[in-house]
């Protein structure tokens, strides 16, 4: 059986909110991607990733929004529901980077985030991104805003990485975006990455009145597994998936 990548619907909502602000036909674009407007009702619901990516591509191309991913990513890191709640439970930035990588797998089943460490440097990275070129660009741009926002929890909201490596080769409306005003952006890389200063790693995050994160990983794993089975069962015809995988 082919693996069907799945993603939380909250990310479709982030791009859909941009369309709403512009007065663009969000519902029609969702339908063209094979999605119902109802997917936005439950941000923690999971949907086939290829449909989510298709919606993002249609939105960017139809509306001519070259920086759609950056606009969609213009949210507080606290705005991503359960992902945010659990990320903010850890005491310092070093643990936040590791938690981000773990929690991302409960947001997107093929998420590939990692922290690359040496004696002198620490890099926050995202491996190769799925989808067509336009899809990959705007998924990556939202992803990198979330990554930078995580470091800003400890470094302050004005912090920017000196160098940002992006996978996309399309620089339109990216280099001149305020998020990168003090960053050198390099395009066409194998991974998305930037260096996190060593002195920031032990910095404490703002305290939150929330329970401990450690006990929640097993429950998230169970919930995501159940949801995957439900989606897959609904997409099979005679035991064969009706969709393709990336």
Residue ranges and their predicted role:
Residues 81-86, 129-133, 213-215:
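Short hinge/gating elements
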Residues 110-202:
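DNA-contacting interfaces and partner/effector-binding or oligomerization modules
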Residues 7, 21, 135, 139, ...:
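Short, contiguous, pocket-lining structural segments
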Residues 13, 94, 137-145, 222, ...:
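Short, well-ordered alpha-helical segments
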Residues 170-171, 175-246:
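Extended mid-to-C-terminal alpha-helical interaction segments
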Residues 1-124:
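N-terminal low-complexity or simple alpha-helical regulatory segments
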